[in-house]
């Protein structure tokens, strides 16, 4: 991932959960800034990474080569007219064989995304994916919502979307290529049972946000 992105960005921050597989050492050798500490989960790692980054534009990706820099240009182009641009992995023709976006998972993301559309209809959102990490956001926009980002798990991604809508930010969704993971497993969707449990937790977050309970 670092090799793929380093020619396209000014800085790469890797959040490393004190892993013992040499991730931090390799990342530093490739020129990344490594932020090592025990994280409480996926959302906490992303949040700490954004806090550690210094740029005016923050780009989030996973470290397992699921996404490529070839899609970064269009995210940044659309960001000129938005507060945040998020990717969607639901375009079938852009999903590599073996990628973790089986039909049931893809349609589950679509269904939950449409629920957010319905509940925040006045903001005119157009979403088809609530779980795509690949996104770009202006630092100023992130600062507006960071105090409301409380989730440490996979619900962090839809929470970002919802909080941008709540501050009347403009969010644009674009299709991005989704590739097979080169290593590791995303624990929140490692099996159908875990995906369903993650989905229910995300639904709970959405409803609490809509009812202003969090």
Language-model-derived ranges and their functions:
Residues 1-7:
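Short, well-formed alpha-helical segments that are part of the catalytic scaffolds
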Residues 10-13, 24-52:
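Conserved donor nucleotide-binding strand/loop of the catalytic core
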Residues 16-24, 65:
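A conserved acidic beta->alpha catalytic loop
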Residues 23, 70-72, 160:
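Acidic donor-diphosphate engagement hotspot in glycosyltransferases and nucleotidyltransferases
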Residues 37-40, 44-51, 69-150, 154, ...:
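Acceptor/aglycone-binding surface of glycosyltransferases and processive sugar-polymer synthases
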Residues 58:
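Short aromatic/hydrophobic "clamp" motif used to bind/position activated sugar donors
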Residues 61-63:
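Catalytic metal- and UDP-sugar-binding loop of GT-A-like glycosyltransferases, i.e.
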Residues 150-152, 161-179:
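Catalytic donor-sugar/metal-binding loop of nucleotide-sugar-dependent glycosyltransferases
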């Amino acid at each position: 991932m670092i090799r793929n992105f380093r020619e396209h960005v000014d800085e790469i921050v890797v959040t490393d959960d004190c892993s013992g597989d040499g991730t931090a050492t390799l990342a530093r050798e490739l020129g990344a800034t490594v932020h090592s500490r025990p994280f409480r989960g996926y959302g906490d790692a992303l949040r700490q990474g954004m806090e550690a980054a210094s740029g005016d534009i923050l780009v989030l990706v996973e470290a397992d080569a699921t996404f490529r820099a070839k899609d970064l240009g269009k995210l940044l182009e659309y960001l000129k007219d938005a507060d945040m641009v998020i990717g969607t992995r639901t375009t079938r023709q852009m999903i590599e064989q073996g990628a973790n976006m089986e039909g049931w998972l893809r349609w589950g993301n679509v269904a939950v995304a449409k629920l957010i559309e319905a509940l925040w209809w006045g903001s005119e959102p157009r979403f088809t994916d609530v779980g795509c990490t690949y996104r770009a956001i202006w630092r100023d926009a992130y600062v507006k919502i960071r105090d409301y980002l409380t989730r440490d798990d996979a619900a962090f991604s839809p929470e970002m979307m919802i909080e941008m809508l709540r501050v009347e930010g403009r969010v644009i969704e674009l299709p991005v290529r989704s590739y097979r993971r080169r290593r590791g497993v995303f624990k929140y969707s490692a099996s159908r049972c875990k995906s369903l449990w993650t989905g229910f937790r995300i639904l709970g977050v959405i409803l609490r946000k809509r009812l202003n309970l969090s």
